[in-house]
Amino acid sequence: MTRSPRSTAWLRVVSLSLAAFIFNTAEFAPVALLSDIAASFSMSAAQVGLIITIYAWVVGLMSLPCMLLSSDMERRSLLIKIFILFAISNVLSGLAWNYWVLIMARIGVALSHAVFWSITASLVVRLAPADKKAQALSLLATGTALALVLGLPLGRVVGQYLGWRVTFVLIGLIAAVIMVGLMKLLPVLPSSNSGSLKSLPLLLKRPALLCVYGLTVMIVTAHFTAYSYIEPFILKVALLSENFTTILLLIFGGAGIIGSMLFSRYSSKYPAGFLIVSFAFLAVCLLLLLPLSFSGWSLSTLCIVWGIAIMALSLGMQVKVLTLASDATDVAMALYSGIYNIGIGGGALLGNQVITHLGLPDIGYMGAAMAILATVCCIFTFVRYSHVLKTSLTN
């Protein structure tokens, strides 16, 4: 049966959303399996949590160099090469016989991640129907949210009953299946508007874009100061069961899907207010993490709001980058991906230090302090650069 060009375009967007799903499942799998990995290597959760920092900082440091090295490559073949490295590295993660082998395997996953996220958002915009670009980005974000709502809880269930190693091997096998789908669905995609090293000085002369990058690293650091250690927090501070921990991760991810839907509906109407409110709600959630940990119901409610906020603001910042750098999208998104992951790594490291010197219960307060500062800076940025930031991605 012959498909219409519009349905074909949506199938391609869906295929990239599935790719986003498996990449984000792999990135955040250690969050759901932290205690099990720590027990396997006779280490503490805080020590093992550093693999999140290492992974994120490899992505942060390598996103732009990897993108520039591949800037002239045809995108379909580049995606296939990325998936081959990704699948092999995940299988090796599952087979890791010591902590250092696990780190090396995770670095392989991180390198594939660095290239994937530097090109994928712009590819989705390019492949989407002409009048549905913001919705296509929202669908890509849904792939990310599904990694939280399905990938992390299912990965945790598999790890709980079959061992954490099986989780990583399964991720590698699923990635291979998605790769075959991409090979069949995607057309030849010559590099377009990728930019080059010459684009970098031009981007760095755009103060509004630099502010968006700065806000990104601040709010992501705040989020991951607490979220990197949410599993041991639920188990050891909230004193909830392992099964309820899985349910909370499911709730958090489901809230991310709601955040994606809210973004699709309201971000164009309220480009400034939508982001500022998202920042503020994230700050409130982190501030209330410990006070509301007294019961499963209160913590579940908090996770719903938290999940909505982080997804909404992540999407909002991504659209601002694409809008402010439409002439060099791949370079701009490589920088965004790198900066986002520097925030992830910084948050995981800051959380590690909070646990070491203050205690696990205080991770929310430290994250909240960062988030409040980020919210104030967000308001200032939108006031200062309102003429360029109060725009949306419409074409």
UniProtKB/Swiss-Prot annotation:
It is found in: Cell inner membrane. Involved in the efflux of sugars. The physiological role may be the reduction of the intracellular concentration of toxic sugars or sugar metabolites. It comes from Pectobacterium atrosepticum (strain SCRI 1043 / ATCC BAA-672) (Erwinia carotovora subsp. atroseptica). One of its GO terms (molecular function) is carbohydrate transmembrane transporter activity. The chain crosses the membrane at residues 13-33, 48-68, 82-102, 107-127, 134-154, 168-188, 207-227, 244-264, 272-292, 297-317, 331-351, 363-383. The lineage of its organism: Bacteria, Pseudomonadati, Pseudomonadota, Gammaproteobacteria, Enterobacterales. This is Probable sugar efflux transporter. HAMAP family: MFS_SotB. Its main location: membrane. Belongs to the major facilitator superfamily. SotB (TC 2.A.1.2) family. It is a multi-pass membrane protein. GO terms for cellular component: plasma membrane. It comes from the Bacteria. Keywords: Cell inner membrane, Cell membrane, Membrane, Sugar transport, Transmembrane, Transmembrane helix, Transport.
